[in-house]
Amino acid sequence: MKTIPDALFGLIGFPVSHSVSPAMQNAAFKHCKLDYLYLTIAAKPEELQNVIASMGPLNIRGLNVTIPHKIEVIKYIDSLDPAAEKIGAVNTIVNENGRLKGYNTDFGGFVRLLEHNRIAPAKQRFTLLGAGGSAHAIALAVCNLGGHLTVLARQEEKAKDLAGKMCLRLSGKTQGLELNDTNLEEALADTDVIVNCTPVGMGNLAGQSLVPPRLLRPDLTVIDAIYNPCKTRLLEDAEKRGARIINGLEMLVWQGAMSFEIWTNQKAPFRLMMKEAELALDENKK
């Protein structure tokens, strides 16, 4: 009886023990009748090179990459797709006959999320909170689709750098500002979509929000990249004020669905993956 899968896939990062990716990816493989297995690989920075080098010998067909390796892993990859190159970070690797290609599905996953929720960036004004890795991907998605973008970050230089680097060709439609009370109030008075890409709302910062409830209103769409908890303080406040809310789990599943499609050349069963991710997240809370 066969016990070895046709190919291995996995998530490399540190830590990865509570990831919902194995549940949703293995369910998708099973649904599509693919004899593949998805595992988590806890690897510290000093172990990264050896893990990437082992992809060929261990028949690892693809990897997702998470914190803290998204930038460092580029050193060990043969080529990058255009989005990953522009963003300067990789979260998906495919092993193509021994050559490793890096992708960034944070970018494409956010585009899919917008499409799924019928948000047309070209007609919208976005305020992005934070200027880290995921913010770079989201900024690129908004700018590529013609959206107006304001980036707010604690360090003004980072906000200005992101706004300028990602959206040079959209002169007059982008700005980067320090995240303070005055700039936040002015930006949100003239925005349609808020996207939180900071850790405020999770971990030690759970129960906190960067946005005072008085600045939220019913005509806003509020997206939080955080998926645990599913409903952050920001989303709770926005919902109470009548705004439309979208949590980070949907964003994560769209990113995972794109990785699945890159690896398999098959359409990802998004609804199934979403259901399995929700179940895994509930299980992690026990």
Curated annotation (Swiss-Prot):
**What Pfam families does the record tag this protein with?**
SDH_C, Shikimate_dh_N
Q: Look up keyword Transmembrane helix and say if it applies.
A: no
Catalyzed reaction equations: shikimate + NADP(+) = 3-dehydroshikimate + NADPH + H(+)
Task: Spell out the molecular function terms from Gene Ontology.
Answer: NADP binding; shikimate 3-dehydrogenase (NADP+) activity
List ligand-binding residues for shikimate.
S19, V20, S21, T66, N91, D106, Y227
Please verify whether the record's keywords include Electron transport. no
Q: Which InterPro entries match?
A: Aminoacid_DH-like_N_sf, NAD(P)-bd_dom_sf, SDH_C, Shikimate_DH, Shikimate_DH-bd_N, Shikimate_DH_fam
Gene Ontology BP, a term: shikimate metabolic process
EC numbers listed for it are: 1.1.1.25
* Signal peptide range in chain numbering: none
Tell me how this protein assembles.
Homodimer.
Q: Which PANTHER family match?
A: BIFUNCTIONAL 3-DEHYDROQUINATE DEHYDRATASE_SHIKIMATE DEHYDROGENASE, CHLOROPLASTIC, SHIKIMATE DEHYDROGENASE
Instruction: List the protein's name.
Output: Shikimate dehydrogenase (NADP(+))
Instruction: Give the species this sequence originates from.
Output: Dehalococcoides mccartyi (strain ATCC BAA-2266 / KCTC 15142 / 195)
